[in-house]
């Protein structure tokens, strides 16, 4: 599957049910080598999920592909339908990570001259992992943040996501342990990059 088969667009509120399903599949399908089942369950209840503020701000991107693009039978074409296969965003707000359920939110606006834009909430469907979709979204986020005047980016990367972000020039700054609703701790990595 080439990147030409992927369409990027801004997320809209009507995408939330599909995003919830995608996030659940992404976390359960791709993060099991880096996190325990208890950490995954706790994270899905606390920090992994939809952040409606990113959608409202127009800074959350979805990648769409044809529903049957992976295993399509050309002899028996099926109706054209796009599905969301990945998502990710950037923020002009202080919150570094967290979904609508996260209580540690800081919704104050950042100053592009002093602060780093936040790269946020990247999730890829397991069937679309390692196909360049996350990289496409990351590039679009960085370009949009640059256009808004930001010269630095930072994130709280999962142990799984840190591999991609490291390959894209992000540098680990420090480990972070996020307390989860079920008493577990979720290790993530604070990463930064110059624009």
Language model regions located:
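A short beta-loop-alpha structural element at the N-terminal edge
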Residues: 7-21
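Small/polar loops that bind or transfer phosphate-bearing groups
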Residues: 11, 120, 156-157
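Conserved GNAT-fold acetyl-CoA-binding loop/helix
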Residues: 24-50
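A short helix-loop-beta-strand connector motif used in the catalytic cores of GNAT acetyltransferases and
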Residues: 47-62, 66-74, 93-97, 118
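Conserved acyl-donor/pantetheine-binding loop and adjacent beta-alpha core of acyl/acetyltransferases
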Residues: 71-129, 139, 144, 177-187
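Conserved G/P- and acidic residue-centered "switch" motifs that form tight phosphate/ATP-binding loops
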Residues: 132-134
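Conserved GNAT acetyl-CoA-binding A-motif
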Residues: 138, 145-158
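C-terminal "cap" of GNAT-fold acetyltransferases
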Residues: 158-162, 168, 174, 178-195
């Amino acid at each position: 599957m080439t990147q030409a088969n992927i369409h990027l667009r801004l997320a809209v509120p009507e995408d939330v049910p599909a995003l919830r399903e995608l996030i659940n599949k992404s976390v359960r399908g791709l993060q099991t080598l880096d996190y325990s089942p208890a950490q995954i369950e706790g994270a899905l209840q606390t920090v992994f999920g939809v952040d409606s503020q990113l959608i409202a701000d127009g800074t959350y991107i979805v990648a769409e592909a044809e529903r049957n693009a992976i295993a399509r039978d050309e002899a028996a074409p099926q109706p054209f339908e796009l599905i969301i296969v990945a998502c990710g965003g950037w923020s002009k707000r202080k919150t570094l990570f967290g979904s609508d359920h996260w209580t540690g939110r800081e919704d104050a606006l950042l100053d592009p001259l002093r602060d780093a834009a936040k790269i946020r909430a990247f999730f890829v469907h397991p069937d679309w992992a390692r196909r360049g979709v996350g990289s496409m979204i990351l590039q679009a986020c960085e370009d949009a943040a640059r256009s808004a005047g930001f010269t630095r980016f930072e994130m709280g990367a999962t142990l799984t996501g840190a591999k991609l972000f490291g390959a894209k020039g992000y540098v680990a700054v420090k480990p972070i342990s996020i307390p989860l609703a079920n008493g577990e701790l979720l290790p993530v990595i604070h990463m930064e990059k110059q624009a």
